[in-house]
Amino acid sequence: MNEPIKEFTSSIPYWQPRVIPLELEQASDEQLDAMKVTVSNTKIGEYTLVLALDPETLQQRTPLFNGIMYGRGGLSRAETELGAVAASVVNRCIYCAAVHANRYSQLTKDESVMDSIFTDGEERDVAKEAISRLNNAVKSWA
């Protein structure tokens, strides 16, 4: 097993579940039905197979997540990713922070904001500016 990553990063780390994912061939009808709410049309990944161990939660979680991250109106996609980074930092979820930081940097074509947030925290000017934009965007929708 690889050593756990202990610092925030914009590079998406390898993810390995700590529980054994569901074997698709052994999935119940309820689990198969729950996996239909996922957005992938290519394959069902290990993450979804882990979530499918609790099909009721998966059926609720996926539409909620998709509504927050991809819904029409509200914050821009980059602002949504920045908000997801903030939530991931508060929750100390290094993997989720990396996924959302990477996507934010792709959307904005600017890695300096995430580098600044992860290196210097919210006190750095570039991080303060991004956080201020996010706060203003949230206030405009409140």
Give short role names for the model-derived ranges.
Residues 1-142:
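Hydrophobic alpha-helical segments
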